[in-house]
């Protein structure tokens, strides 16, 4: 993706800026958690993941578990290969947070999704 963006920027006479390029993925995820990002896993698509990941919070323990999956199955800790997708429910930039009222899990034995069926915005405490 970076190469594609750089090529397009070059064609348009723009410069590409990628401040997170070559940064430690586990470190970046831990910084997001410490900064107050609340995210959940909404899709897992790689060997090593189980359905228990669906709807799971991305927290310090999840980052450690992603590092273990990297060692055992080659999973990109940051999900850069499409191994997983997350949904941000809250972060310091949001004026309200997303509250999931109802969700369903789909699982085919190898991959699955956490499908949000009902959600609402709520004020922050």
Language-model regions: role of each:
Residues 1-125:
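Nucleotide-activated chemistry modules centered on ATP-dependent adenylation/adenylyltransferase
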């Amino acid at each position: 993706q970076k190469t594609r963006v750089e090529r397009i920027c070059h064609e348009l006479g723009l410069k590409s800026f990628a401040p997170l390029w070559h940064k430690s993925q586990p470190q970046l995820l831990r910084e997001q958690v410490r900064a107050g990002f609340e995210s959940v896993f909404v899709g897992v698509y790689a060997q090593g993941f189980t359905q228990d990941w669906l709807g799971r919070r991305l927290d310090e323990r999840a980052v450690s578990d992603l590092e273990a999956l990297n060692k055992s199955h080659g999973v990109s800790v940051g999900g850069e290969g499409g191994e997983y997708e997350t949904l941000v429910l809250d972060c310091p930039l949001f004026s309200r947070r997303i509250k999931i009222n109802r969700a369903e899990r789909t699982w085919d034995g190898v991959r699955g999704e956490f499908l949000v069926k009902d959600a609402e915005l709520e004020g922050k405490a």
